[in-house]
Amino acid sequence: MELTWELDLFRAADAEGIVDLYREVYGDNYPVKTVYDPAEIIRQDACGECWRAVARSAEGEVVGHVAFYRSSPPNPRLYEHGQLMVRHAYRQTDAAFALMNYALAEIPGRHGLEQIWGEAVCNHLFSQMMTRDNGYAETGLEIDLMPAESYTQAFDAAAASNNRVSTLLVFRSFKPKPQTIYFPPVYQEQLRFIYAAVDAGHRFEPALAPLPAGMSTLAELATFTGAAVSRITVQAIGADFEARLAQLESEASTACAVVKQ
């Protein structure tokens, strides 16, 4: 019998089905544990932390899912696009492609998203092909980002690995804006190469000014225990930058982070 589905935006009644879908695809190994809490999924939608789209079978079962959500970047208007998955029985259909196209057509415009980003895993080509086909640009390679156990249930033996999984960092802008970008001269060639795919008339200037003496560094550490990843986000650099960075790197080591970003 041919499998069919309906694409729709998230409803509260989908929350239990989304949790069940995560368990079918990832078991209990997904590193962000809030995905296993139906009440948290509903709360995130209500307050705009996460917007989701789903594919439902004719019987109303959630058979596919994708999300736009706030993650580690400090900009509350920059949403990560990810968590695309379908039930095993639907993997030989185009449900995932249809769901991603539907979500991109509906959610960013509905909620005024100006830019989104994602992490396309490197243990298969599927997500890389989808992001490329949908106008994303690759801006970085995150080496050994995800633990192997996150994928032992999600993929077959060919895509599963005993090693950590790297990802491509990708961005898509819906409202490109020219910016003045300051960069260390030593990285000029590399950064111009990276920005070439997302250039919106940016102006590039060498970062030659000294650290501001009367200002403290504003930076924070986010640790994702399940993935053994620590991310240091710097919003403003002050005279104490070197000491503050060393402190946060030490805290990341104490948290047993395998990957530090």
Task: Walk through the language-model features, giving the residues of each.
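Conserved N-terminal entry element of GNAT/NAT acetyltransferase domains
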Residues: 1-13, 185-234
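Glycine-rich phosphate-binding loop
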Residues: 90, 131
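Catalytic cores of nucleotide-enabled group-transfer and carboxylate-activating enzymes in metabolic
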Residues: 2, 37-43, 52, 96, ...
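Conserved acetyl-CoA-binding loop of GNAT-fold acetyltransferases
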Residues: 132-141
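A conserved beta-strand-loop-helix scaffold within acyl/acetyltransferase catalytic domains
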Residues: 9-15, 19-89, 120-121, 237-261
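Conserved beta-strand-loop-alpha-helix junction that forms the acyl-donor binding cleft
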Residues: 117-127, 137, 145-146, 259-261
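C-terminal "cap" of GNAT-fold acetyltransferases
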Residues: 146-185
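Conserved acetyl-CoA-binding loop-helix of GNAT-fold acetyltransferases
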Residues: 86, 92-107, 116-118
